[in-house]
């Protein structure tokens, strides 16, 4: 029986504390919980607004996690989800001390995803990236585009393989959404076509097409819902006020348990990728949306990870046009003409793909096979 240690950081979901209570293992240092019979150690980390304190907290988490790892026994494999790269580094050191294997999972390509492309810091990050790739026992990445980008950075490409992300179909499925439990102040019952985005409101998304699309369809029975937080939220809110876009609703994060209902409330889920970052990331929410039977409206360039993934499955309207005016026009025309039956077909196609290829059981088995092959 292999023992696996998974090293990552998480946000606390208050609704989960009742079913997975945390108790202090070492007071002030780490907590312990049980997840379906699996012992989990948690290193609490405060979120500071001050940059220096955030860096200090980041370093503290790495040191404490490394020390905790040293005291774990009978570890066969350490799985390191990324980012950040530094998790991969300390886990390689830990694996050498413990005499175990390491798997590094590439979810985003660092430092490629960063806006700066040169300088001393970027050069050091590139060296760190290659160190992690070449000193891990195995490296997994989520799709062929990512594989093609990073394969040349390996001395031994045979250790790199593709294992996609998955969705928990027990929580997210086309039968799981009850819109009656939603707050009617945030989610009113209307006959309008509802487009929705839930997640980080940051730089990875391109918000200009959304504002232009909302302005172009103003007065039409179409509404746009944006749920989340992030650095671009104040910018969006200011634009909505400036242009008097009553058809755009910007809402705070909602409880995770409500997400199936929120997805059911929407007619279409939209994702508009930032052209500067669209090659380095794949929004995992795509799987969740498909599992819940919702069609997608996606703006991204040709041959990007999200376009390459979706174009084979018939579950999304894909916009690859570069011109802002043309892409907004194409989206507006589609929204004004698409029927409910066409949207339902796109949604059903997505559900079938998830069940066949991207369920929790299917993807987990791929990791089991990888671990046993090490």
Feature annotation, model-predicted:
Residues 1-6:
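Short, small-residue-biased leader/transition segments that mark boundaries at the very start
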Residues 70, 86-89, 93-97, 120-141:
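Membrane-proximal helix-turn-helix segments that form the acceptor-binding/catalytic region
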Residues 116, 151, 167-185, 191, ...:
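Acidic anion/phosphate-binding donor-loop and adjacent secondary structure
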Residues 145, 163-166:
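Carbohydrate-associated surface elements
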Residues 187-205, 210-214, 225:
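Conserved donor-binding/catalytic core segment of Leloir-type glycosyltransferases
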Residues 205, 255-262, 269-290, 295-308:
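Nucleotide-sugar-dependent
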Residues 221-228, 234-260:
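Nucleotide-activated donor-binding/catalytic signature segment of Leloir-type glycosyltransferases, i.e.
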Residues 341-357:
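A short, well-ordered alpha-helix in the C-terminal region of glycosyltransferases
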């Amino acid at each position: 029986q292999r023992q696996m240690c998974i090293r990552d950081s998480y946000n606390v979901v208050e609704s989960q504390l009742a079913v997975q209570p945390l108790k202090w293992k070492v007071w002030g240092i780490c907590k312990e919980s049980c997840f379906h019979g699996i012992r989990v150690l948690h290193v609490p980390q405060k979120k500071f607004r001050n940059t220096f304190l955030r860096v200090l907290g980041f370093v503290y988490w790495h040191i404490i996690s490394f020390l905790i790892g040293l005291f774990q026994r009978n570890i066969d494999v350490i799985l390191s989800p990324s980012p950040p790269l530094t998790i991969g580094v300390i886990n390689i050191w830990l694996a050498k001390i413990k005499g175990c294997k390491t798997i590094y999972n590439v979810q985003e390509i660092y430092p490629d995803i960063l806006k700066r492309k040169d300088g001393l810091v970027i050069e050091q990050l590139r060296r760190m990236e290659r160190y992690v790739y070449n000193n891990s026992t195995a490296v997994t990445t989520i799709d062929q585009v990512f594989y093609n980008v990073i394969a040349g950075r390996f001395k031994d490409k045979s250790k790199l393989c593709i294992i996609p992300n998955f969705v928990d179909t027990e929580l997210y499925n086309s039968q799981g959404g009850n819109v009656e439990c939603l707050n009617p102040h945030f989610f009113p019952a209307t006959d309008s076509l509802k487009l929705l985005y839930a997640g980080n409101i940051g730089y990875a998304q391109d918000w200009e097409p959304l504002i232009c699309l909302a302005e172009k369809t103003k007065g039409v029975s179409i509404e746009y819902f944006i749920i989340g937080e992030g650095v671009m939220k104040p910018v969006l809110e200011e634009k909505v006020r400036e242009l008097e876009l009553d058809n755009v609703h910007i809402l705070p994060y909602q409880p995770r348990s409500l997400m199936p209902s929120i997805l059911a409330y929407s007619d279409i889920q939209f994702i508009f990728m930032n052209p500067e970052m669209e090659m380095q990331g794949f929004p995992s929410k795509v799987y969740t949306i498909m599992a819940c039977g919702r069609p997608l409206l996606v703006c991204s360039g040709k041959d990007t990870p999200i376009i390459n993934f979706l174009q084979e499955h018939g579950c999304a309207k894909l916009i690859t046009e570069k011109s802002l005016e043309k892409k907004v026009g194409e989206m507006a025309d589609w929204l004004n003409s698409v029927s409910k039956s066409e949207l339902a077909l796109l949604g059903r196609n997505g559900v079938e793909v998830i069940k066949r290829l991207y369920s929790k059981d299917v993807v987990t088995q791929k990791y089991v096979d990888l671990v046993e092959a090490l």
